């Protein structure tokens, strides 16, 4: 039995099983409507991500360093290890956020303003891009890419400071609050499995666990946790 499966038994219901991971960014822009485009998007994103991580300084051993165990009210942060805000990790997350979340969204917004004839409203009231044959008519006004790229970079940098919260989840659950008796049991389990004393100490910024390489995965996180789908993966070296 792993630590995570052991901790799951302490919580009510049946907490979902998932791989231990650190979320770099959510809302990655992938075309899910056309299988061929989905495949090419996934390949492009993972390839660019490998280039990005290879470009970071090779000045220390661990990209990921685990710290204290903590808990929040949120389902997805019920029980987790804090992760140190390593400069390389933050830089990598910022690059991914800029290229594959902020920039595509900003380009789309600008196109809606400059070229409204390219868009229509679907049956749910959402603004969507017309299919290619529907959007052939009308002049296309160019958008200011240098400005958009600069603004996307600024927004991603701001996100890395105000929102990026690296952590490694151990349990997903709705239980709140965690009482002192359960918390003591959690600490004992972690100590038994990982030999970490005082695992919830505020002074614990490095519990001795960490790594530099690993596997980068692009995951479709829709619906139940057990239904999440790995769209693609790449080894980090």
UniProtKB/Swiss-Prot annotation:
Top EC category: hydrolase
Active site: 21 (proton donor/acceptor), 167 (proton donor/acceptor)
Keyword Transferase annotated: no
UniProt main location, coarse: Golgi
A GO BP annotation: cyclic nucleotide metabolic process
Function recorded in the entry: Involved in the metabolism of ADP-ribose 1',2'-cyclic phosphate which is produced as a consequence of tRNA splicing.
Name assigned to this protein: 2',3'-cyclic-nucleotide 3'-phosphodiesterase
Location of the region described as Disordered in the Swiss-Prot/TrEMBL record: 117-137
Family per record: Belongs to the 2H phosphoesterase superfamily. CPD1 family.
EC id: 3.1.4.37
Keyword Hydrolase in record: yes
Biological source species: Debaryomyces hansenii (strain ATCC 36239 / CBS 767 / BCRC 21394 / JCM 1990 / NBRC 0083 / IGC 2968) (Yeast)
Residues reported to bind substrate: 23, 169, 172
UniProt GO cellular component terms: Golgi apparatus
The reaction(s) this protein catalyses: a nucleoside 2',3'-cyclic phosphate + H2O = a nucleoside 2'-phosphate + H(+)
Subcellular location: Golgi apparatus
GO molecular function: 2',3'-cyclic-nucleotide 3'-phosphodiesterase activity
Keywords: Golgi apparatus, Hydrolase
């Amino acid at each position: 039995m792993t630590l995570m499966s052991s901790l799951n038994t302490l919580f009510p219901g049946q907490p979902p099983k998932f791989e231990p991971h650190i979320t770099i960014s959510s809302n990655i822009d992938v075309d899910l409507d056309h299988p061929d485009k989905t495949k090419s998007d996934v390949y492009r994103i993972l390839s660019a991500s490998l280039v990005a991580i290879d470009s970071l300084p090779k000045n220390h051993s661990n990209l990921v360093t685990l710290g204290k165990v903590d808990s929040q009210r949120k389902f997805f942060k019920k029980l987790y290890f804090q992760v140190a805000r390593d400069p390389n990790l933050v830089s990598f997350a910022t690059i991914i956020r800029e290229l594959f979340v902020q920039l595509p969204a900003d380009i789309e917004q600008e196109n809606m303003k400059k070229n409204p004839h390219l868009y229509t409203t679907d049956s749910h009231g959402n603004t969507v891009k017309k299919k290619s044959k529907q959007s052939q008519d009308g002049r296309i006004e160019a958008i200011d890419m240098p400005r958009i790229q600069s603004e996307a970079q600024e927004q991603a940098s701001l996100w890395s400071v105000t929102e990026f919260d690296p952590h490694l989840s151990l349990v997903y659950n709705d239980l709140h609050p965690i009482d002192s008796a359960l918390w003591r049991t959690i600490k004992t389990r972690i100590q038994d499995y990982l030999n970490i004393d005082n695992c919830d100490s505020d002074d614990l910024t490095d519990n001795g666990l960490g790594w530099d390489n690993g596997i980068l995965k692009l995951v479709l996180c829709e619906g139940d946790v057990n239904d999440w789908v790995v769209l693609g993966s790449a080894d980090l070296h």
